[in-house]
Amino acid sequence: MADIRVKICGMKTRADMEAAAAAGAAYVGLNFYAKSARSVTIAQAAALASDAPVGLAKVGLVVNPTDADLDAITGSVPLDMIQLHGQESVERVAEIKTRYGLPVMKVIGVAEAADLDPIDLYAQVADQLMVDAKAPKGAKLPGGNGISFDWQLLASKKYWQAPWMLAGGLTPENVAEAIRKTGARQVDVASGVESAPAQKDPDLMRAFVEAAQAV
């Protein structure tokens, strides 16, 4: 289905951005979480976002950001959306949305059915949701760990108040199955299109988008 929208997260170079656009991605992610190998500085992100191919929505990934963090990022980087990938409360999501005037995507980590319970509340304030695999205990990163969760958990949970995106261990080989099982209309990928840690592969990007849109 050509209306499946793909987000490729972890852009680090102009070549990454161009390859994502050429592959047909709708969104690209700029990672501001310093502990991640995919992270970029504000200066790097500003250069990438300012020169981004036309049509790519630029999403800034942050984890439990302070206002000072977001002031610095949004003051320099022309983002189209903020992705909150930490333990931000419903109230904090609403605050950020109001303060910065940008659409906000809230990530919900899922390992079991009970993890889906907060989604209805977040859907009332967030512009979009991302349903991702919950990071393993002790993991250094909140996402981008290349692990998935039981997609059947979403079989009867497809309709929330806000649009949502599926993430977690998706690859060109399994994204079609994930879409069929969950009904997702949007999917996110990072490690699944890398040939080495934090190294995006244009061929894998293209294969991923083609597989997603062929469902």
UniProtKB/Swiss-Prot annotation:
Its EC number is 5.3.1.24. It is an enzyme of class 5 (isomerase). Pathway: Amino-acid biosynthesis; L-tryptophan biosynthesis; L-tryptophan from chorismate: step 3/5. Pfam families: PRAI (PF00697). It catalyses: N-(5-phospho-beta-D-ribosyl)anthranilate = 1-(2-carboxyphenylamino)-1-deoxy-D-ribulose 5-phosphate. One of its GO terms (biological process) is L-tryptophan biosynthetic process. Keywords: Amino-acid biosynthesis, Aromatic amino acid biosynthesis, Isomerase, Tryptophan biosynthesis. Disulfide bonds: none annotated. One of its GO terms (molecular function) is phosphoribosylanthranilate isomerase activity. It comes from the Bacteria. CDD domains: PRAI (cd00405). The keyword Ribonucleoprotein does not apply. NCBIfam families: PRK01222.1-1. Belongs to the TrpF family. This is N-(5'-phosphoribosyl)anthranilate isomerase. It comes from Ruegeria sp. (strain TM1040) (Silicibacter sp.). The gene is trpF.
